[in-house]
């Protein structure tokens, strides 16, 4: 099959397109082994089998087609859509990632001038937008694992490439999350290893700014992660388990409202240290953050996240109070006002939250009373279905959780003494667990 024309499908190719929609991977594999099937055949609209599989959200089918040589960057669709665009429109994060790993081009535009990320944003698939905007090909990192020019050793030991790539491609830029990713990997949790990593990040940042098609967003992300790595090195040099100390410092809230001032200052400092002061993105970030008083909205983290990942703040989704991970669903059983990924994050944050838990519980109960009063008024007026901005009535009542008195561990007094230290010197592993978590 030397050339491929739209709509000129063999019987087996027509069967393949049907199997992609309704059949099994095994059936598709059998058809792909036929000499009468071209893996990049085009239907009458210029769609390849891979585009069909991506649009229908068939992950294993996509992997099979790619193994058989499917072109992830095919641009023959009548409206200029690519497999990556269909994956992003479907909202399937795994397929979007697979397409990117297969070499799908991210800057191709369709007939209305939109890229895959822009199409995903248009239909509200913000997770896919973040994945595309944060993708960094492993090959670009592997370049630094080989000696270049007169170098006798590579700038990055090959064993560090995998763990570092995981952090580079993360869509969660919360400093606590980055420190956690470093801490949980023995290869990275070493001052010398992190030193090599942050220097490579700085080189990538420089390359992004000096290349012909300048990439300020990626440069800022590399610089920011480099700054977090350097902060990790400072704490690691103080002794064992000092990354736990850094995490506690980032989470420690001020007495008045629990706002993590140190975390805010670290992020602002990282942005301020960006070495290319003429960059448009830097100027936008500074204009958005500088006038804001520490503790007010928007926070430096929210502004930076929106600029780098493309995620928007108004999306109706919860984030973990500890690590910023999206989709957290476990509420503190006492105050029901803070949300976590799991008990690990809840335990890590308890040293800071225990000082605010009771006051937050009071706020929650007042909201419940106001919501109940508002609901009764709606029913009295004969209009019970009018939407309200108050706390969701479906949330469990505060009394159903563990009572505040029983929730404070016996060592809470010791914890209060620890909290007086600005950097929170105790290990997060020693932190009391506090109240249990409840499903949202």
From Swiss-Prot:
This is Ankyrin repeat and MYND domain-containing protein 2. GO terms for cellular component: cilium. The keyword Metal-binding applies. A zinc finger (MYND-type) spans 320-357. Interacts with the retinal-specific guanylyl cyclase GC1. Keywords: ANK repeat, Cell projection, Cilium, Metal-binding, Repeat, Zinc, Zinc-finger. ANK repeats lie at residues 45-74, 79-108, 159-188. SMART domains: ANK. May be involved in the trafficking of signaling proteins to the cilia. Zn(2+) 1 binds at residues 320, 323, 341, 345. Residues 371-440 are annotated as: Disordered. One of its GO terms (molecular function) is zinc ion binding. The keyword Metal-binding applies. Zn(2+) 2 binds at residues 332, 335, 353, 357. It holds the Pfam family Ank_2. The gene is Ankmy2. It comes from the Eukaryota. Residues 371-381 have a biased composition (Basic and acidic residues). It is found in: Cell projection, Cilium.
């Amino acid at each position: 099959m030397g050339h491929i024309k739209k709509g000129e499908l063999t019987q087996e190719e027509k069967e393949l397109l049907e199997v992609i929609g309704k059949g099994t991977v095994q059936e598709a594999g059998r058809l792909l082994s036929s000499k009468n099937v071209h893996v990049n055949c085009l239907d009458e609209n210029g769609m390849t089998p891979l585009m069909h599989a991506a649009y229908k959200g068939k992950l294993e089918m996509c992997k099979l087609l790619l193994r058989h040589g499917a072109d992830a960057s095919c641009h023959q669709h009548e409206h200029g859509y690519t497999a990556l665009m269909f994956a992003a429109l479907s909202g399937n994060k795994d397929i979007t990632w697979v397409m990117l790993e297969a070499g799908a081009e991210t800057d191709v535009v369709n007939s209305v001038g939109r890229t895959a990320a822009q199409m995903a944003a248009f239909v509200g698939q913000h997770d896919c937008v973040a994945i595309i905007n944060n993708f960094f090909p492993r090959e670009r990192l592997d370049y630094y694992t080989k000696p270049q020019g007169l170098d006798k050793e590579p700038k990055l030991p090959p064993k560090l490439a995998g763990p570092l790539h995981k952090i580079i491609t993360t869509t969660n830029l919360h400093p606590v999350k980055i420190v956690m990713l470093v801490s949980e990997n023995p290869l990275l949790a070493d001052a010398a290893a992190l030193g090599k990593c942050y220097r490579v990040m700085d080189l990538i940042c420089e390359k992004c700014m000096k290349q012909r098609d300048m990439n300020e967003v990626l440069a800022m992300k590399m610089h920011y992660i480099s700054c977090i790595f350097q902060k990790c090195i400072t704490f690691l040099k103080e002794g064992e388990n000092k990354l736990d100390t850094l995490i506690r410092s980032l989470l420690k809230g001020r007495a008045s409202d629990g706002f993590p001032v140190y975390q805010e200052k670290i992020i602002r400092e990282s942005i301020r240290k960006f070495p290319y002061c003429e960059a448009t993105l830097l100027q936008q970030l500074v204009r958005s953050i500088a006038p804001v008083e520490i503790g007010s909205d928007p926070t430096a983290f929210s502004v930076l996240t929106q600029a780098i990942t493309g995620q928007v703040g108004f999306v109706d989704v919860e984030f973990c109070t500890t690590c910023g991970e999206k989709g957290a669903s476990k509420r503190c059983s006492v105050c029901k006002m803070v949300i976590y990924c799991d008990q690990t994050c809840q335990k890590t944050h308890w040293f800071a939250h225990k000082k605010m838990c009771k006051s937050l519980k009071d706020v929650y109960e007042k909201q419940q009373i106001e919501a109940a009063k508002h609901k009764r008024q709606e029913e009295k007026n004969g209009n019970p279905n009018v939407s309200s901005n108050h706390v969701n009535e479906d949330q469990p009542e505060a009394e159903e959780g563990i009572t505040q008195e029983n929730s404070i561990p016996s060592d809470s007094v010791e914890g209060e003494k620890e909290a007086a230290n600005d950097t929170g010197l105790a290990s997060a592993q020693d932190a009391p667990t506090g109240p249990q978590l409840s499903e949202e």
